[in-house]
Amino acid sequence: MGGYELVDGRPDSGSLETFRILPPRGRARLLAPASGNELIGSYSTFANGRGFRGAAITSGLWAAVRLGQSDRVLDRRVSLVAHDGVEGSPLRELLESVLHTPDFSIAIRLTSGRPNAKLVVAAISPEGEPFCFAKLAGGPHVAELVRHESRTLADLAAIEHSMVIPEVLFAGDWQGVETLITTALPMRRLPRSAVTAHRASDDLCRLSGMQAAELAASGYWDRMKGRLATLQSSDGPEVGLIESSIEFVEDRWGASEFEFGRGHGDWSRANLGLAGKQLVAIDWERSQADVPRNLDLAHFALIDDGRSAGSRLLDVTLLERHTAELLALAGRSSDRAQALTALAVLEMVVRFAEAVSAGLEANDAKFGPLLRALTLRPVDSVPPSQG
């Protein structure tokens, strides 16, 4: 891509960039600059759980670098090598053109097993801080997500709101690859309660105006059924489960009136943080202007509980209770907790199915089984919160 390729080790000639591979064993997830603050900063930038574990690994990297042990601890390397006729690094030249400085190192996050897999590149300052992020789509499915995020950020930049969102530095085709480059936003991780985020999610719903409609008659539900039709036509995975789940939702809540407004689409700790008292929100590629109000809160509960559960199957009742608690923190009624939970889980199953249908390596070991458990279980009242 872009006139060069990745090769193992450090070749004798033609190397444009050299990276250390993190983690040092197992599947590569991050290509980090080879040394110093940039190496440490690249891990901190992409750790996505800026909690205890992320801090511990960052401390370990810092110690290895300062003690001169990085070559021994991080012994896997890969290099970017230019194709014949290519001079310099086209990717570096692109980043230099938007940053107006050559003083940075490149870090690359490798994503697989996810429904939005793409290369994410960071330009890291000599002090180890990110200057910007570049998303490079690897195919038509992801290219549309990248284009959609570019449009969403432009729309949000044109209206008044209280969130801090990335500024677009470049958006469009670059050497045949749909690309989005945005500013990197400094943010500290959300506290455990994350009340600021929960309240902001309800404010976000109103940004594009709100409308009320029966679920089955809404544009949102038409789009969901259209996605199912596309999967059916391409013999996509989990079609039977998605069909039965859509019937399940329509039978129980299709005639119920919902409010619809702007949703982020991936409202989770990995994409949210704080800058002072303001909420920072990144990664808007799944945002839509007509989703059920507070669907983001159900997604937040789903991702939070999923990380806590590890490889264990999530408990449907506990997940619904968590959604109800987040609704209460946002000042909203918990009446829709069950419906929103079902819609959040269905959305994730559809995303993974769409990715697999598009030829991506997307492994859903969690949401499909959860959706089956949810649709086979009687619909009762949401259990009361335990505090």
Regions found by a protein language model. Give the residues of each.
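Short beta-strand micro-motifs within the conserved protein kinase catalytic domain, predominantly
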Residues: 167-177
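Conserved short submotifs of the Hanks-type protein kinase catalytic core
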Residues: 176-187
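Conserved kinase catalytic-core helix
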Residues: 149-165, 185-231, 242-257, 265-268
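Active-site acidic catalytic loop and adjacent metal/ATP-binding pocket
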Residues: 118-123, 251-295
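ATP-binding glycine-rich loop module of kinase domains
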Residues: 117-147
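Active-site activation/catalytic loop segments of kinase-like enzymes and analogous catalytic loops
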Residues: 295-331, 345-358
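ATP/Mg2+ or Mg2+-diphosphate-binding catalytic cores
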Residues: 312-321, 351-387
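Juxta-kinase regulatory segment immediately upstream of eukaryotic protein kinase catalytic domains
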Residues: 2-3, 7-8, 15-110
